[in-house]
Amino acid sequence: MFHGPTSSFLAPKIAFALVSFSLGELGDGLNIFQGIYLVGIGWNEGSIGIALSLMGLTALLVQTVAGDIVDKTTFDRRNFLIAASIVTALSASAILFVTEGNNEHALIFISKIIEGVASSFIGPCLAALTLASFGPDHFDAVMASNILWGHVGSVASAVLAGASAYILYPNIKYCFLVIGFSALIAVIFVRFLPEGDPLMGRGFKGKVALDESGQEEIIEGAPTEDLQHEQEAASYMSVFSDRNTFVLCLTGFFFHFANANVLLVLGELMGGDNDDGSPSRSAIPLIAGAIVTAQATMSIATIAGDRLTEKGFGRKPLFLFGLITLPLRCALIIYWKDAGDAFLLSTQVFDGLGGGFFGLIHPYLVADITFGTGRFNLVMGLTASCFGLGATLSNYIGQTVVEKLGHVASLSGSLVLSFIPVILFACFMPETMGKRGNIANKATEEKGKSYTNMEMA
């Protein structure tokens, strides 16, 4: 059954945009600034590395399960989103209670594990609510808006955190108050989101959805009432063994394996360190500038990708464009490593283009592949886990190479690896645009035949 907006105060698409903006500010807990703060109060690099890796490792293990829970839950997904936002903010804010000295590791380690679990539910919940409310026909446009405003929120978060960290340096812990404020905003606006059709939110075909203006419309080719409730989810084996899902997971793994370490190396090449190993005050605006440049470019890339999709450009060329920006970025950083901070900072434009197109097309591809199977959020979680595994290995191996062989060797490794996802996706992923309805119709028709045969028997 479809549940429309609970209030006419905000149009549903605007409510989703405001929630996405707030969650973008919540981001990843401003990990890079947390690392700066912990170095400043006496933590060693090894302890910081463990602390900042725990969230990613936990999310890596939990995201697929979180997606499956979001698919199968009978509870209101809006409550899941509220709980996940609050817990993420509280756990990320635990750093405010760490005292000076290389101690109190348990508090941060435990909070990062909790943060990893809670944050794993945010993406699937928001995607599920979007699909449940707007259906397959308007999902792309509204999801593009969500992603755009998420990037804008990340820009706002980086600007606020960077400015307060620079002003309060070296006592920068109060910049983390932006995390709690962002969670509060998210909780307020989540209540204005429609619940939509819970079955449609997991990738089944529904009868009613909202258009972009918030008006209800009948979905073309909708199943009968009996068939809608008789829809069964595809087996786990069929989902995990699907070739397109496998190619997407492998492509994303290698993209993030090559990409994640690059920002760390870039930060090490820009600015400078104090004698104790902590970033200098002059490095803080550069670090914030790198984040802002990338996120602002991602916003532009998201708008461009949405417009191109509306004009009929397929998923494959847009996703490939995002992948190709990574080897260009690595090559430019190597070439400009001694050219000055301005040149190095400008390479973040390529990070923004790559991340923008990758982040936009990823949920489109998952919706295309899974619609009609009832496993949309499961595959969103599975792919996110593969991406996270690549990023975690990238940070660990990339920084080990930096320590042993230097920055150029680490970047050269990323450059070579960055061609693997391009080749994989170009050779093995078919174009999926326009196939979403076909998958859903096929699933409905097969169920209809089965239902008719049972009645005849």
Stretches with model-predicted labels:
Residues 1-10, 197-248, 442-456:
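Juxtamembrane intracellular "pre-TM" segments in multi-pass secondary transporters
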Residues 2-56, 246-251, 256-273:
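Helix-loop boundary and gating motifs at the non-cytosolic
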Residues 34, 121-134, 357-372:
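Intracellular juxtamembrane helix-capping segments at the cytosolic ends
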Residues 62-75, 165, 300-314, 402:
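Helix-to-loop junctions at the C-terminal end of transmembrane segments
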Residues 86-102, 324-338:
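C-terminal ends and interior cores of transmembrane alpha-helices
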Residues 111-150:
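Cytoplasmic helix-loop-helix junction between adjacent transmembrane helices
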Residues 141-161, 384-394:
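Glycine-rich segments within core transmembrane alpha-helices of 12-TM secondary carriers
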Residues 173-191, 410-427:
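Symmetry-related core transmembrane helices of the 12-TM Major Facilitator Superfamily/SLC fold
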